[in-house]
């Protein structure tokens, strides 16, 4: 018979720590949140603005496209501008096809980047492949930069895929084409990592990723990678899609492998709405890690979904206002109120679960449901502290939350000084 502990997260997989511009990935460090810009990197103003927005939202690493000379020339200027803004955010260069040439022709770019991303599927073709891969690895060694060897099923090494398909056809019990593709993805990453080490790049400068667009494929390839190596792993479901579909798919896939102790850094690859907010992917990544109990970024607001007992929208509006206010203030509060990210607030809509849920929170309120007495008990640290009445219940509770934060977490700030 299973015990309660059988369902806890599996221990984190042991991986080699990699220092990416001062941010540690792997080696037991907290799972790192990262994101990527969608600006033209040569447009310095727009790229700086988007990197800054992603960084403020909580992205600890930011990847930028380096696809031509103009982009490469812009990288050190982008880095300098960010530093002038007080943002020491590690920038990752995303290279495809001509990365070896861009790094060689633009040494200031090679120096300014914190990490290089290489795709084994398009770093070079035929007899040029290993040579051009080696040139990038040699640049990483020269500038003491880590690399991410990022395999993507959409640009998979066709020579390796063909070879494994041929071997599979000759096997007595052949695998499905999908299974062979998974194996090819994993082998491509491991073969490339071995080659990088042979050239002289140490394992503590290598991160691996294996991007696919289907949930079950992601679970399979990362489970396979985790069994066959101890490299730090970058998780991400490529082409996850837009809106709720992209969020659900990314959460289902990465949630499973994270629960099994696999993964050292994550990116949620959401397709934004036209002119949409790019920082949404950062928020989703943070929320995924937080709801699973792996990290804490922003205070949690628990709120009931509502039912026939809660025909008023007051509790919904209050929960939304408090959540928005907490998130908006976190850039300042993170330094002003150490530990505030662990705060739990409950905003409940009626008497059924309201008092009980509120007692479990640090501070909670149980608003009156339909037909209930127009009074709202407030619970602080598990004890009923007061009852709010009248037309200003919502604003009164917001003031109580602010006061609670100041009294509880402001003391930590004073003690630290």
Curated annotation (Swiss-Prot):
Signal peptide: none annotated. Gene3D superfamilies: Dihydropteroate synthase-like, Sulfite Reductase Hemoprotein, domain 1. [4Fe-4S] cluster binds at residues 304, 307, 350, 357. Disulfide bonds: none annotated. Binds 1 [4Fe-4S] cluster. One of its GO terms (molecular function) is 4 iron, 4 sulfur cluster binding. Keywords: 4Fe-4S, Iron, Iron-sulfur, Isoprene biosynthesis, Metal-binding, Oxidoreductase. Its EC number is 1.17.7.3. This is 4-hydroxy-3-methylbut-2-en-1-yl diphosphate synthase (flavodoxin).
